[in-house]
A protein has these predicted regions:
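Short secondary-structure capping/turn micro-motifs that flank functional sites
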Residues: 126-128, 216-217, 285-286, 336-337
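Active-site-facing alpha/beta catalytic cores
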Residues: 77-79, 83-85, 91-199
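Conserved, well-structured core domains of diverse proteins
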Residues: 1-112, 117, 127-131, 152-153, ...
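A glycine-rich phosphate-binding loop feature that marks nucleotide/adenosyl-phosphate handling sites
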Residues: 125-126, 193-194, 251-264, 324-340
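Internal helix-turn-beta structural module
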Residues: 298, 305, 315-318, 328, ...
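Glycine-rich phosphate/ribose-binding loops and adjacent secondary-structure elements
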Residues: 158-307
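Aromatic/hydrophobic pocket-lining residues that form π-stacking "cages" and hydrophobic walls in ligand
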Residues: 107, 233, 316
Length: 392
């Protein structure tokens, strides 16, 4: 088998891992249609880049400082869970238990070396060689109105819980679990976003999980990109805290999953407002094993996953370092630039060469026109005019 054949097979495996379904088009067709594909909303990430270090922020000096990736999960009333790398591994499709064992071994090895990641799973993964879990488990709990944590909690003692929000019944379950569990509770709102964020946070949820792939299939976000979902989710959380007494210990986090399966996308998602990125188990295994010629047994996959995550850690530290930050979580939309008007509108990202968002430019023109014509509009009316112009 030559290298070209291997590449085709690996690309097909990655496609299967990402979508859960086989390919229905040939790679040759994809190459021919590349210009058309790049013009679609699904590739807006390619039009967003991080700018270099500013004069007001000296470049990162490796001799004097280190880049912190740490993130604490848990609000003021909850027990905190700290991740050394802002990633949580989660299962997006059913995969073989042996693959989960490999992830378990890799996460343990990472934790032993000070690189703690989280895992979202319905079950606790054990192996015959290493039964003790050394990383935080966020256990998925069933949406049963009469559900109790006692039985599940005794079995696995998870550091956190994950609840999928479906309807008002889910809110009752959250209320019950909040009374029983003192660790962080994350609520997946992918099926109902952008609704109920404020209510869920008021009931004590420690964070929101959003799968951009699911949300962009909803009617509200049809034709939009993950950039818009992340930006709107961050705004929803920020709006919840407006007018409230500032408290550094009360920080609900945003976990973004879905279309964030590379180091570059992880950094861009963080700049747009994600505190933690959900990295799918299937994509993790597929990416880490992409260039390996070794037999895919549990140990070799675990080693590949371990090395892949260390490589990813190095990559996501590099960009904030170039921006002059010592804390990964200090990056923001102002550190990004885009050549796409759509990306600028959806993510409130400044345009390249102008350093202002497209919306800011339109707002300036509208305000000048209103002033020249002597038109009197209040703030709400002005915003309505802007929305009609930019198509929001």
């Amino acid at each position: 088998m030559n290298d070209a054949d291997k590449f085709i097979i690996r690309k097909a495996v990655l496609e299967l891992a990402k979508t859960g379904t086989p390919r229905f088009t040939s790679i040759d067709d994809d190459v021919r249609n590349l210009p058309n594909v790049n013009s679609k909303a699904t590739n807006r990430w390619d039009y967003v880049t991080a700018i270099g270090a500013q004069l007001s922020r000296p470049p990162y000096d490796p001799y004097r400082e280190t880049i912190s990736l740490d993130i604490s999960i848990g609000r003021k009333t909850s027990r905190k869970v700290t991740l050394n790398i802002p990633l949580i591994i989660y299962g997006n499709i059913a995969i073989h238990y042996s693959s989960l064992e490999s992830v378990h071994l890799a996460l343990n090895q990472l934790a032993e070396n000070g690189n703690v990641l989280g895992l979202i799973s319905e079950i606790e993964i054990n192996t015959t060689r290493d039964n003790k879990r050394k990383y935080p488990l966020f256990k998925k709990v069933p949406c049963s109105p009469n559900g109790s944590l006692e039985e599940d909690y005794k079995k696995s003692y998870p550091e956190g819980l994950v609840l999928e929000y479906k309807d008002e019944t889910s809110l009752m379950i959250l209320q019950n679990f909040r009374k029983e569990f003192d660790g962080p509770i994350l609520v997946d709102v992918s099926e109902v976003f952008p609704l109920y964020i404020k209510t869920i946070l008021e009931e004590g949820a420690d964070g929101i999980i959003i799968d951009t792939n699911k949300v962009t299939k909803n009617k509200i976000y049809q034709g939009k990109h993950a950039i818009a979902v992340i930006s709107d989710a961050r705004k929803a959380i920020n709006d919840y805290y407006k007018g409230r007494e500032e408290n550094d210990d009360d920080n609900a986090i945003l976990v973004i999953a879905g279309d964030v399966n590379s180091a570059g996308k992880i950094v861009k998602a963080a700049a747009l407002g994600a505190n933690v990125v959900g990295y799918s188990t299937s994509m993790l295994i597929a990416h880490s094993n992409m260039y390996s010629e070794k037999p895919s047994d549990i140990s070799s996959i675990a080693e590949n996953v371990y090395r892949h995550m260390l490589g990813t850690k190095g990559e996501i530290k590099g960009i904030p370092a170039a921006l002059g930050y010592s804390d990964f979580h200090n990056i923001s939309p102002s550190d990004l630039r885009t050549s796409s008007i759509d990306a600028s509108l959806q993510g409130n990202i400044p345009l390249e060469g102008i350093d202002r968002t497209y919306k800011d430019m339109i707002e300036e023109v509208v305000n000048e026109y209103i002033s020249e014509k002597g038109i009197k509009l209040n703030s709400s009316e002005t915003q309505q005019v802007l929305r009609s112009i930019v198509g929001e």
